[in-house]
């Protein structure tokens, strides 16, 4: 074999080996990618399994038990000193201040009122002395009220076979051809939307009291009374809400069995809107809608031009001429959900409104390999919530100044840290990181106004109030029932937020609205913050003395 042939052969061998090496490297690369994907899939499946276990067997709340003592080798974190603020325990006098007092005099029997020594008649030394007190509860009483009309005739005119008659005025029925009274309907609404008691349970309760009223009748009472008497107040609250500068919004699911064009098992939504921390009386409103389209908040909030605090649901982007302020609690929740189960047990999420004394959270800046990224993300969020708790009682302008001074540096470090992360594709950490990156501007928008809150928890708490009823009732039978529930819940939650007696407020509306539903002047006096309502709906009420035919007149 010639020298040239040997070179050509060697060249072919080298090219063949190089081709094989390239193929092997490509195969190795593909296998590595496949291994990474399988690891990612395994991690995602483990996260999903852990989430299912938590949903079925664990608590769903973010709140966790107090952290246990760490092992000796775990890093010790130095924290700033703090003073525990123990909430003062209320006295009996404070707890029972609004209850009527009835005194029972315990006297000495007649046969024992003579002196054992001289048999003289004994007399009282002074006024009876207080010994103890107890709380007595009188069960509800249901009774039938028969309105009997007096008819007068002139006896002199009767002699001439010509009668002059006068009849006593009988109050109009709340609902024509129905035995429903203001107290009965208010009682039903109160137990439905304040106590979360479904109609069938109310029917059972009334049966125990001697009144056999079908659940369908109770539902019809609420639907008709809501539409005829409560709707004008609801609409007036809506007008006032639109004028505000800050509104919280949220939505939660519900089910309506009989809705045209929808299957009974399909999902509908109850939308919640709550006024912000603007120093004005609180307004809470619910609106039923068959879906989750952004057109629903767009229509409900038409005319509102201010700050809309919500979660990062894209539907709110349809609301025009507003600044979206997204909820930082949602962002924190994403990082919290990315934590392993054992880490969740040792991490406590800070609550701005809690009275519990808290240590200032420390954000790890050294030995980062000892911490998982989700743990650091929660630490950044907790730091922001801790600062918010320190500033929550400041005037809005001062609060804004302090926010810019104290929280901007935390945000800058947080966002810079996010840019260093490259989480596994599809895992919960990636979802948390992408959530924070994609919504960083709207998450920080609360810094622009000292009246804004860092979270949308105000609206979420209102959603939970409805969720209690939903858990008990499971569904609404009709669209009319869902709309009635939205109206009643709006008035109940607004009354609660303004420190009114809820039953008394609903009862007062049903007493007065039949006489002023056509005019707005009377409605102004029936709004939760009016002087008339504060005077008559802040304590207890006696429905036997305040009735449809005997109640104070509205101011002129």
Question: What is the predicted role of each segment?
Answer:
Residues 15, 19, 112-113, 151-153, ...:
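Catalytic center-proximal scaffold of phosphoryl-transfer enzymes
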Residues 1-176, 219, 248-249, 310, ...:
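Short, flexible loop/hinge motifs at secondary-structure junctions
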């Amino acid at each position: 074999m010639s020298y040239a042939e040997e070179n050509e052969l060697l060249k072919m061998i080298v090219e063949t080996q190089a081709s094989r090496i390239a193929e092997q490297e490509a195969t190795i690369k593909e296998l590595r990618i496949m291994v990474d994907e399988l690891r990612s899939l395994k991690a995602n499946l483990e996260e999903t399994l852990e989430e299912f276990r938590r949903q079925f067997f664990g608590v769903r709340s973010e709140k966790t038990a107090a952290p246990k003592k760490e092992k000796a080798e775990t890093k010790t974190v130095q924290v700033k000193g703090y003073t525990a603020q123990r909430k003062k325990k209320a006295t009996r006098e404070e707890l029972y201040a609004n209850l009527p007092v009835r005194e029972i005099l315990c006297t000495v029997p007649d046969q024992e009122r003579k002196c054992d020594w001289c048999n003289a008649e004994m007399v009282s030394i002074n006024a009876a002395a207080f010994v103890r007190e107890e709380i007595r509860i009188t069960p509800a009483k249901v009774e039938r009220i028969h309105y009997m009309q007096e008819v007068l005739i002139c006896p002199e005119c009767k002699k001439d076979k010509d009668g002059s008659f006068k009849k006593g005025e009988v109050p109009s029925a709340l609902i024509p051809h129905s035995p429903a009274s203001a107290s009965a309907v208010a009682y039903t609404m109160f137990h439905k939307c304040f106590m979360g008691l479904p109609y069938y349970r109310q029917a059972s309760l009334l049966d125990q009291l001697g009144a056999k009223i079908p659940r369908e009748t109770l539902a019809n009472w609420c639907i008709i009374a809501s539409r005829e008497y409560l709707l004008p107040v609801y609409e007036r609250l809506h007008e006032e809400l639109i004028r505000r500068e800050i509104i919280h919004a949220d939505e939660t699911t519900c089910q309506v069995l009989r809705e045209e064009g929808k299957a009974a098992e399909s999902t509908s939504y109850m939308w919640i809107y709550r006024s912000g921390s603007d120093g004005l009386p609180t307004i809470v409103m619910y609106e039923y809608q068959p879906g989750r389209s952004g057109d629903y908040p767009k229509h409900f909030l038409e005319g509102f031009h201010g700050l809309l605090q919500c979660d990062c649901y894209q539907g709110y982007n349809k609301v025009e001429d507003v600044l979206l302020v997204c909820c930082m609690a949602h962002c924190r929740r994403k990082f919290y959900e990315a934590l392993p189960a054992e880490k969740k047990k040792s991490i406590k999420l800070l609550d701005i409104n809690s009275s519990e004394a808290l240590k200032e959270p420390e954000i790890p800046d050294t030995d980062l390999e000892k911490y998982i990224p989700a743990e650091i993300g929660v630490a950044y969020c907790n730091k922001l919530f801790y600062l918010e708790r320190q500033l929550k009682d400041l005037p809005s302008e001062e609060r804004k100044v302090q926010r810019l001074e104290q929280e901007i540096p935390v945000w800058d470090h947080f966002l810079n840290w996010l840019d260093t992360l490259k989480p596994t594709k599809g895992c919960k950490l990636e979802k948390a990181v992408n959530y924070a990156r994609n919504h960083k501007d709207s998450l920080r928008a609360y810094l622009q106004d000292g009246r804004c809150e860092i979270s949308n928890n105000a609206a979420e708490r209102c959603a939970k109030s409805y969720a209690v009823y939903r858990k008990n009732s499971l569904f609404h039978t009709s669209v009319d029932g869902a709309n009635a529930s939205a109206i009643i819940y709006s008035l109940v939650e607004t009354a609660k937020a303004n420190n009114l007696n809820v039953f008394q407020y609903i009862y007062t509306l049903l007493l007065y609205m039949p006489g002023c539903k056509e005019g707005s002047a009377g409605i102004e006096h029936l709004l939760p913050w009016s002087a008339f309502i504060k005077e008559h709906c802040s304590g207890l009420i006696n429905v036997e003395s305040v009735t449809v035919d005997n109640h104070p007149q509205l101011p002129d």
